């Protein structure tokens, strides 16, 4: 049954251990889980979320376990013994984070869960990892620079893509051509870094008056903490039948309809552009508290350097005259976005399989090294 604490098979030592903080990361782990099961590879899966859909998977190859929440769960995860631990969790082992680097895990490997380099990771987030399964080769310079600055040994870095995009690409329905009128999807971040707060909502009114089919998809957190602002926007736009609000958990329906997206620094920009080969208008805003992030040492954020390849990059002032910006963005050729995706994201559509292959190959390499060491000891 869903969320049931199933009896754990008492494995003294696990070869492969997947550690998840919860259901938000299910689509990141699912393609890897599927690949292990297809290959007949046994593994363990631990999660801090009793509602994690992975707990409902019934397969003798998968030893899954709910380990609780909070600091106690992090301690349980850190106490496991494994050859390889696959985790999306940054900050493991950093001062102040509740999970120390697991001492009895030989290879701690990070799976990425968004398109971007490490500039907007908190400082030291990946310092205690042994391997980074990168989205693409573009991540390598920033990882190596941080290692060099801190005198860290070089991690194994291999470009294996983004598994959750496997899952989304399988569901994506790309439409041919452009709708009439064009569909504009507005997907802001929440809080003071979002385009609605920085630019105000009047640009939505301008889009509605211009006759575009406008979809506003608030961030899920906005639905919890910014209800007053959203109520004001509802009231402002209630007389425009060409404006709709999308509060569904799954963004697929809105994304598949849209011809262009307006956003800020949200990673959803890359998901939309790469999945649907449609342009994005990015609001260029400075990073708040950059000293907390790796950008303080790197000096540059990869996502900022490439945002123009998704479409248009604009200032808050440009939102006062948003219609010409939309018209320019709509001229961005799909072929250019597809080419950018191909050069940025490795193993498109088969990342889960690639990560499973890397894991199996790494175990084989570890076994060979152990055998060689044992043979060398025996001949002494």
Task: State the predicted function of each range.
Residues 86-87, 110, 134, 186, ...:
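Redox-cofactor binding/interface segments in oxidoreductases and associated redox assembly factors
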Residues 154, 267-343:
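Catalytic binding pocket for nucleotide-activated donors in carbohydrate/polymer assembly enzymes
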Residues 2, 308, 314-380:
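C-terminal amphipathic helix plus adjacent low-complexity
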Residues 64-73, 244-247, 309-319:
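Short acidic-hydrophobic, aromatic-tinged amphipathic segments that line or gate anion-handling sites
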Residues 25-41, 163-234, 316-319, 330, ...:
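Conserved catalytic-core segment of nucleotide-activated headgroup transferases in glycan assembly
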Residues 14-169:
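Active-site and donor-binding regions of nucleotide-sugar-utilizing enzymes
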Residues 69-77, 228-270, 275:
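Donor nucleotide-activated moiety binding/catalytic core segment of transferases
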Residues 2-23, 186:
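Nucleotide-activated donor-dependent transferases that construct or modify glycoconjugates
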């Amino acid at each position: 049954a869903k969320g049931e604490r199933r009896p754990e098979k008492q494995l003294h030592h696990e070869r492969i251990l997947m550690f998840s903080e919860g259901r938000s990361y299910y689509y990141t782990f699912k393609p890897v889980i599927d690949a292990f099961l297809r290959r007949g590879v046994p593994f363990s899966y631990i999660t801090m979320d009793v509602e994690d859909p992975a707990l409902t998977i019934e397969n003798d190859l998968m030893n899954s376990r709910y380990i609780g929440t909070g600091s106690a769960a992090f301690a349980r995860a850190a106490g496991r013994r494994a050859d390889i631990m696959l985790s999306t969790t940054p900050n493991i082992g950093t001062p102040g984070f509740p999970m120390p680097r697991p001492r009895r895990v030989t290879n701690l490997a990070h799976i990425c869960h968004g398109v971007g380099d490490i500039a907007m990771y908190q400082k030291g987030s990946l310092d205690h990892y042994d391997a980074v399964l990168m989205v693409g080769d573009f991540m390598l310079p920033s990882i190596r620079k941080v290692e060099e600055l801190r005198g860290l040994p070089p991690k194994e870095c291999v470009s294996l893509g983004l598994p959750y995009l496997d899952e989304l690409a399988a569901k994506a329905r790309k439409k041919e051509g452009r709708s009439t009128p064009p569909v504009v999807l507005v997907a802001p971040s929440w809080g003071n870094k979002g385009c609605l707060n920085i630019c105000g909502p009047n640009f939505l009114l301008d889009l509605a008056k211009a006759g575009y089919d406008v979809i506003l998809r608030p961030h899920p957190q906005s639905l919890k903490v910014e209800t007053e602002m959203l109520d004001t926007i509802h009231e402002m736009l209630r007389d425009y039948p060409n404006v709709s609000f999308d509060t569904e958990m799954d963004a697929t329906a809105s994304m598949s309809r849209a011809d262009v997206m307006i956003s800020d620094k949200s990673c959803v920009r890359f998901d939309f552009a790469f999945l649907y080969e449609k342009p994005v208008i990015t609001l260029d805003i400075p990073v708040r508290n950059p000293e907390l992030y790796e950008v303080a040492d790197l000096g540059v954020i990869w996502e900022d350097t490439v945002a123009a390849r998704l479409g248009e990059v604009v200032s808050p002032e440009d939102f006062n005259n948003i219609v010409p910006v939309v018209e320019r963005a709509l001229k961005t050729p799909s072929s250019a976005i597809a080419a950018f995706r191909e050069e940025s994201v490795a193993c498109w559509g088969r990342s889960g399989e690639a990560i499973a292959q890397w894991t199996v190959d790494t175990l084989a390499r570890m076994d060979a090294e152990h055998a060689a060491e044992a043979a060398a000891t025996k001949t002494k």
